[in-house]
Amino acid sequence: MNSLVQKVISKMNISLEEYNNLIKDVDLSSLENPSCFKNIDIATERIKQAIKNNEKIMIYGDYDCDGISATSILYLTFKKLNYNVGYYIPSRYKDGYGINENMVDIISSKGYNLIITVDNGISQIAALKKAKELNIDVILTDHHEILNDLPLCYTIVHPSLKENKEYLPECGAYVAFMLSIKLLGYVDEYLLTLASLATISDMMPLRLDNRNIVKLGIKSLQNNKYDTLLKLCDNPSFINEKTFSFSIAPKVNSLGRIIKDTKVNRMVSYLTSCSEEEQNTLLKYINSVVLERKTITDEAFKKIDLSSFQNDNVIVKVFDDVCEGVIGLVAQKVLMECKKPCVCLCYGEEGILKGSCRSLIGFNIAEALNDLDDLLIAHGGHAQAGGLSLNKENLPLFKEKINSLAKGVILKEKEKLIVDVTKDDLSEDNFLEFSKLAPFGEGFEEPYFKVKISKDNIIKISNGKHIRGSISSSCSFIGWNLGEREFLEDVYLIGKLEINEFRGKQTLNLKVEEIQ
């Protein structure tokens, strides 16, 4: 074990036994047995019966990366079984989240006998009741929290219904993947990779079965070079969990964020296409949507006069022309820039304001929304992020009260796990051994590294806006938007390690986020 890894596991309080478990190789035998899911055999038999009887089957998904991946997994599963089925990704704007009564009527009118929900359904009580009235069986596969009694349907496959096993939150695509294994009788590695992508994008805790499937998904993409996914990568030559979270997932999510009609289904078409020509046509469309999403988000952020909120405890901003799907991205940018809680809102139907909230540790946004329940139509979320809707008439009082709730609150950012290292620790060989601890993510955060550097090694670039330089012969650094200060003495750089590629050459780099 090298010096870098020793310092990391010491800081993370990881024992030698835990370390060995974390870095050990995984294979397909490491996957969870699908039979751990209650009712999965019932679901499998009903689907086999439907195939035998030539029934029409509809997969009903969701517009985020998890729902799109889950839909793609089951659609490809049926394709491998040589059975044609339908699928539908609802529009965030036209249909809303989850299967609804109107869509059940439409599905029924087209002669479907069986609906399989993926990544939705557990809270869609009225729609499932409607399906039963129309003699449509529903196999409900979902992972969202069960808040009320179980809905009435043919059967439910859900992580929290497992028997004789510790509950671990798993995403909708993971549940769909387990069902695919039961139907196919084997593990398809492309479907596994889609499930691992969704596990990362839906921020599932990276331990136990979630950790195993993500490790397998990364390895599968590295080995099999799936064109559909690699074409969505910013750097396809270096694949890790960040490839999924920062490169592929945002692109998969883009269509659901801003497309207001059924074209959101093109993302499933892309992920399930076998034709290179069709892939390239769809990819061109996807890339145009990604660019549009970035433009909308950036322009919305630029419209905010942050100085006008200097005296506010909570930033509350209403946008006239920003779509609901990007409002959370804007809220996150505001939070990162201002370091104070924010609520970003846009106009929905009939003057109703819909939006997203973001907060720092110290001000629980979910509790604040609960306290203001009488002013809101709906709300939900957790301590640092939430969503809400309210009538515009209630906006002034909402602003006043949420600012009052945040008065005197001491805010702090999430504490970084910082490992003190020397220049000699930062070598490519040491980094490669450290990388065996990956994947990092929810519940297993990637550490930051703190290293001392001479002021003479710091070079300002882009008219003094950014900094770069060398830490050692094998490690460089880059610091975006950190060039304003004067470097009159040696400093400590704090950042994360990454591999950069330029003209076919890979180098170790510290991406600096803080200077001390």
State what each model feature region is.
Residues N394-E400, F487-Q516:
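OB-fold single-stranded nucleic acid-binding module
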Residues N2-L114, L134, L152, L184-E400, ...:
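Hydrophobic helix-and-loop "lid/oligomerization" segment in the mid-to-C-terminal part
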Residues F431-P447:
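Non-catalytic interaction/regulatory segments
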Residues S472-F487:
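Beta-strand/loop nucleic-acid-binding surfaces
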Residues E442-N463, V491-L497:
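Structural detector for short beta-strands of small beta-barrel domains
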Residues I461-G469, Q506-L510:
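Short aromatic-glycine-enriched beta-strand elements
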Residues V421-K423, A438, L497-I499:
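Beta-strand elements of well-folded, non-transmembrane domains
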Residues I107-S108, T117, I122-A131, I136-M204, ...:
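Conserved phosphate-handling catalytic cores of large alpha/beta enzymes
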